Amino acid sequence: MSSGTLYDKVWDLHRVAELPGGSTQLFVGLHLIHEVTSPQAFAALRDKGLSVRCPERTVATVDHIVPTTSQSRPFADSLAEEMLSTLERNCADHGITLNGIGSGRQGIVHVIAPELGLTQPGMTVACGDSHTSTHGAFGAIAFGIGTSQVRDVLASQSLAMSKLKVRRIQVNGRLSDGVSAKDLILHVIRTLGVKGGVGFAYEFAGPAVEALSMEERMTLCNMAIEGGARCGYVNPDQVTFDYLSGRAGAPSGAAWDRAVSWWRGLASDPDAVVDDEVVFDAASIAPTVTWGITPGQGLGIDECIPQLEQLEPGERPIAEEAYRYMDLQPGTAIAGVPVDVCFIGSCTNGRLSDLRAAAAVARGRHVADGIKAFVVPGSEQVAKAAEAEGLDRVFQDAGFEWREPGCSMCLAMNPDRLEGRQISASSSNRNFKGRQGSASGRTLLMSPAMVAAAAVHGQVTDVRTLSLQSAV
């Protein structure tokens, strides 16, 4: 195996051909599809008389459009029903495994592939979804792609790509109590900007990253795209192997031993040269909340919305736009900003550990008057495990709604939407204008524990000020 960074090694292993203009045709080890970006791609295959090249490397689920209050068929939304029915037909026609509702394996695409053991170190992973970078947590190189590229991967199991530069995000020390991987990535994006990673793959490294669980690493890599990076990854280690061991899609027996031996060699070499490196001190990071209309407009919980003159000239136009849209004034403390809706879920923070963290806040407390709060597990497996631990009861006793798995209020493609000028505390990944369903709705991004704290107080609250109880 060639030396260098993990990105270099995985790239070299998957090169099919060098193309005119300097791009490379890469083999795709795992192609994940869902109901939103695949219909046009399958239609293009039919028009050209093509079949799916590697159905055994293609895995489907339904997530974006599914309702979370009742998933009985047919859906009340006829368009959503049509999209799911189309996915079912396309998968049946091409021999693709569909992890459908009620299968025990359905959920958000970036939740189910890891929990099923399908995402593994050294893979290239593609999906018609921006947050495919999630899978880099395993030491994979994972890209979000557009519908035309979904078509190309279905037809050829390969993808034309230009090689990225590598920036190491070195995080020294350890995160303080009450500070999560979500806070870390929001802090990184705040520091480097939403365009700071353009042209880069982010290698997350250092003691603070190594101390994260796999689910926390997934949160970190999930939002690399929000910082402009095409992908983000963590070098595989024993934490990775322990997570994968025994999962349905992982090797077993002697094949497992061989796989682990090979996976260990994928990690970036100690003397690997990267194109850039940025160092962070984990201990200096506080619970972080966005105040504006991009994920880069974040603040530590003890900070105030910045005055215009405190910002770099290039940041001022978007800040002025954010002041108007969010109706938040410069100098306002982010702690204490009132909220209307609290959402815990998404491919960023809808896993079991996320629900445990939020439940530790909710236990023995109650949602504040007038607040709508709900929890949407990231998958059927997450829901089952959470219910086995009694987390559903913890949330319901506290006044949260316990919903069925799906993307939910992360985006406005299902019935879970903000109304009017409502402001949400959300554990999702994007706070763009109108992202959560209302053209004038407002979103504050934060960790699941911080969302739970906001729910019980009716306003943005420093979770570190609350005594936490085990939710199990």
Curated annotation (Swiss-Prot):
<dbReference type="InterPro" id="IPR036008">
    <property type="entry name" value="Aconitase_4Fe-4S_dom"/>
</dbReference>
<keyword id="KW-0004">4Fe-4S</keyword>
<keyword id="KW-0028">Amino-acid biosynthesis</keyword>
<protein>
    <recommendedName>
        <fullName>3-isopropylmalate dehydratase large subunit</fullName>
        <ecNumber>4.2.1.33</ecNumber>
    </recommendedName>
</protein>
<comment type="similarity">
    <text>Belongs to the aconitase/IPM isomerase family. LeuC type 1 subfamily.</text>
</comment>
<keyword id="KW-0411">Iron-sulfur</keyword>
<dbReference type="Pfam" id="PF00330">
    <property type="entry name" value="Aconitase"/>
</dbReference>
<dbReference type="GO" id="GO:0009098">
    <property type="term" value="P:L-leucine biosynthetic process"/>
</dbReference>
<keyword id="KW-0479">Metal-binding</keyword>
<feature type="binding site">
    <location>
        <position position="410"/>
    </location>
    <ligand>
        <name>[4Fe-4S] cluster</name>
    </ligand>
</feature>
<feature type="binding site">
    <location>
        <position position="407"/>
    </location>
    <ligand>
        <name>[4Fe-4S] cluster</name>
    </ligand>
</feature>
<keyword id="KW-0456">Lyase</keyword>
<keyword id="KW-0408">Iron</keyword>
<dbReference type="InterPro" id="IPR033941">
    <property type="entry name" value="IPMI_cat"/>
</dbReference>
<dbReference type="InterPro" id="IPR001030">
    <property type="entry name" value="Acoase/IPM_deHydtase_lsu_aba"/>
</dbReference>
<keyword id="KW-0432">Leucine biosynthesis</keyword>
<keyword id="KW-0100">Branched-chain amino acid biosynthesis</keyword>
<dbReference type="InterPro" id="IPR050067">
    <property type="entry name" value="IPM_dehydratase_rel_enz"/>
</dbReference>
<dbReference type="GO" id="GO:0003861">
    <property type="term" value="F:3-isopropylmalate dehydratase activity"/>
</dbReference>
<comment type="subunit">
    <text>Heterodimer of LeuC and LeuD.</text>
</comment>
<comment type="pathway">
    <text>Amino-acid biosynthesis; L-leucine biosynthesis; L-leucine from 3-methyl-2-oxobutanoate: step 2/4.</text>
</comment>
<feature type="binding site">
    <location>
        <position position="347"/>
    </location>
    <ligand>
        <name>[4Fe-4S] cluster</name>
    </ligand>
</feature>
<dbReference type="InterPro" id="IPR018136">
    <property type="entry name" value="Aconitase_4Fe-4S_BS"/>
</dbReference>
<dbReference type="GO" id="GO:0051539">
    <property type="term" value="F:4 iron, 4 sulfur cluster binding"/>
</dbReference>
<dbReference type="InterPro" id="IPR004430">
    <property type="entry name" value="3-IsopropMal_deHydase_lsu"/>
</dbReference>
<dbReference type="InterPro" id="IPR015931">
    <property type="entry name" value="Acnase/IPM_dHydase_lsu_aba_1/3"/>
</dbReference>
<dbReference type="GO" id="GO:0046872">
    <property type="term" value="F:metal ion binding"/>
</dbReference>
<comment type="function">
    <text>Catalyzes the isomerization between 2-isopropylmalate and 3-isopropylmalate, via the formation of 2-isopropylmaleate.</text>
</comment>
